[in-house]
């Protein structure tokens, strides 16, 4: 629908693709790794029909946005979000971050505050801190797990994405929560992303510590998570985010995998719309 310039690389503009639909209070939907704004297909119509202005955008390196070599750290990604909000002059925004996108929500608020932001939603999101190390033994992703992800992307990215999307939409033995054409569609979206961006984002979402950012969140916050999320398990992420933010609310979706906004759109949308109306 439109693009904005957020920087340059070798004199070439770095552009973010975004779509802006509906009228009313703005809701900005931030997609997960390694997909695009298309992953909100089941949310955009529901929000627009309920009277909201809905903005989706493709993170740099993904979807229809530019694919620069660098800039996949959360400080840069939060700045990209900041530039989009400024460009559209959005006020009283609800930021909804899914998976990796929850990191942008946290880092944006931690860096830029809440002058433009009214509410925050973390959906299957990576904060507070996934990395497992000697300094943070309660994490879930250790160096070996992260290396496995990175090697998968470097050695055969398409084969990795094929397996990853199977786990993404599966809850335990339930692998029929989305159709095979839908899974393959999402694999194709991921396949079109920047290989370098796909790789660099692994280190960003697995090793970035958002605990300091969450400590600065003083606005109404909702955590939506699937209780069967094998990609970003609730107990290591959403549960801790919920506990870290005063008066946060939580909607734990029974049988929900990581990609619960697609597998359980009714439950996801009901939780989101109820929170928006509070």
Annotate each PLM feature:
Residues 10-70:
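Conserved HGGG/HGGXW glycine-rich cap/lid loop of the alpha/beta-hydrolase fold
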Residues 31-33, 93, 97-99:
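Conserved alpha/beta-hydrolase "nucleophile elbow" surrounding the catalytic nucleophile
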Residues 76-93:
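Conserved acidic catalytic loop of the alpha/beta-hydrolase fold
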Residues 230-236:
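Conserved alpha/beta-hydrolase "acid-adjacent" motif
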